[in-house]
Amino acid sequence: MDNRLRNAAEVNYIDIAMPDVKGNTVKLSEVEGKVVMVYFWASENAEQKMFNLDVVKPVYADYKDKGFEIYAVSLDTDKAKWATTVRNQELDWINVCDGRGSASPVVTTYNVQSIPSLFFLVDGDLVSSTGVRNEATLRSFLAAHLR
């Protein structure tokens, strides 16, 4: 049996391990936070860049000290461009990318159909995030789970 599937039985999600901007491998299972948002995106997309600035950054600033963390998985194929975007936008949450784009195994594993795609781990358990698509719904979700 695949190790990823064995680990999934222990947690209810399949772990991700990818390099960050500095080249260090960061595992999703090692991220600390009461609520961890697994955020699939691509820096190649202008709308995604605006989503980072208009939605994700302000919400992260308000909730990061309350137990909220982000594990952002870029589906870019140009890792240098992705890293530049992360630095230029000052995205100070966890950002990882394997450079394989839509061919990355995590796309299939997490059934990513479109970007942005958001999944949430609450106290280590994967929970439904249906309807979380903008700042108001993200804030509402976090307010309900970060009590």
Task: Identify the residue ranges that each predicted region occupies.
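Hydrophobic beta-strand anchors of alpha/beta hydrolase catalytic cores
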Residues: 37-38, 70, 118
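Structural microenvironment flanking redox-active thiols in thiol-disulfide oxidoreductases
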Residues: 49-88, 102-107
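N-proximal helix/coil linker or "cap" segments that precede and/or mark the start of modular domains
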Residues: 1-19, 29-32, 61, 80, ...
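Short, contiguous acidic/charged loop-to-helix segments that flank catalytic cores in large enzymes
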Residues: 25-28, 41-50, 70-75, 96-98, ...
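Short gly/ser/thr-rich secondary-structure transition/capping motifs
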Residues: 17-23, 97-101
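Conserved redox-active cysteine motifs that mediate thiol-disulfide chemistry
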Residues: 33, 37-57
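Loop/turn elements at helix/coil->beta-strand transitions in domains of secreted/extracellular proteins
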Residues: 32-35, 65-68, 90-92
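Thiol/disulfide oxidoreductase modules built on the thioredoxin-like
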Residues: 91, 102-143
